[in-house]
Amino acid sequence: MLIIHSLRQYLLKRLNGLILFTCLAMVATSVNAKATPSLEGQSVLVSVHPMALLIKSAWPELEVSSLVSANQSPHDFVLKPSDMSNIAAADAVIWMGETFEPYLAKALRGQRQVDLSVTLDEADAHANDGQAGDEHENDEHADHHDHDAHIHDPHLWLDPNGIKKILSFVQSSLALPAPKAFIAQYDAWLSSAATTLIPHKDVGFVSFHDAFHAWVETFKLNQVAVVTSNPEKPVGTRHIVEVRNILASGQVQCLFVEPQFQSRIVTKLHKGLSIKVIKIDPMASKFLIDEAGFIKFYQSLLGSFTQCFSGPQD
């Protein structure tokens, strides 16, 4: 009987220990779940389409949409009542800041928001000073506008070296998990793109719209001239003549134009010249907001540049 009693006590102790361990494990799981809540069902509205691609690619569990549609230009965007409804319905809004998107400032009052303009710093300004100064020789009026645009470049999604900085800021602002899978994929793409573009770093080209300044800086490309910083504003005749002379001089391989801007100026620039005219889309209008969207978008930009750099002129 003594042996049976001792065995019973031993088994009870083991059972109590197992119950205690199970309870502690359940508590730990509950605490961890509260610390890292599921992203399922959380909606994030992003002001511009290509930035929405980035956010969705980094955090696929989020419900991500864009305010300015893929085929619109943010340069002349006007809020509609339906846009106001979408803003109110979102759990958070990611935008470029009041300087670049003044039409959103009032609409976002009281709304949980992430202002990406704060990711711009003095290093960006110093890096951009050089080219802004060069454009002074082309057109005094254009220079003043371009200088401002370079110091405060709103095309944050077109800065390959700034992508991880943006993601880090969004992550901390919205208490999101680190997007490790996307960052690994992006680092691999960035390395491959640099290898592809290095042999062409001396090939000159002209851009209609100065959206790719940071891209040019990152890959050390040779952007010889830019037609305009803001396609919604008129370009001086003197500057048009100067850019056309550059296109005719043999210094450049191609002229980049954008599908959002069907400008008669483009025709004036290249008519009668043997120069490649290549479409490049900084607004990612052909890409869906999904997990693979941003890398596909960047790969398409890379494809436009390699199309310019390879083969004879038309």
Task: Identify the role of each PLM range.
Residues 2, 32-314:
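Extracytoplasmic metal-acquisition and chelation regions
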Residues 13-28:
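Bacterial N-terminal signal peptides
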